[in-house]
Amino acid sequence: MRSLDNISWERLESEGFVCYPAKSQDGPGEEIIFYSGFPTPTGRAKIVPTELVPPDELPDEDFPLVLTTGRMLEHWHTGAMTSRAKALNAQEPEAVVSMHPKDIGRMGFTRGQKVMVETRRGEVTLTLRADRDVTPGMLFMPFCFTEAPANFLTNPQLDPYGKIPEFKFSAARIRQA
């Protein structure tokens, strides 16, 4: 990536860190971007409030949980490059679904067991992980594992403005695999 051209492995190893973006190979990088202004006619940021658009699909009796998808630290995006890194795979070797510990106990599951996460679009088998950072009533799946394609489970309904699918909110259920 051109934006990383001035941040080499050698530089990271010798300096410990480099602020991004770095405009030259020996420059410190920009700690604060847009310090001298934003790329607008006034130089000020343009902040536009939006109206809240409710999700297209809400939890119900059949699918009482909310599935949200996202990234994980060890595998970037789809894992196309990071899944080949032995060190990263050693830290996160398999697809997981994270759930609040109270939900795990309330629903009779145990940490580490194989579960099936299902939405109206399909189902995927994963290992269950307890995570207090996941809101009760929600499931979190990273989308980087090809063997457990999280975004195949999400609602394809597009946001009316951004034209982005609802990757962050899909009605779901979980059961023993």
Language-model region placement:
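Long, low-complexity segments enriched in small/aliphatic residues
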Residues: 1-87
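Long, contiguous, secondary-structure-rich segments that constitute the structural scaffold
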Residues: 1-15, 78, 82-98, 102-177
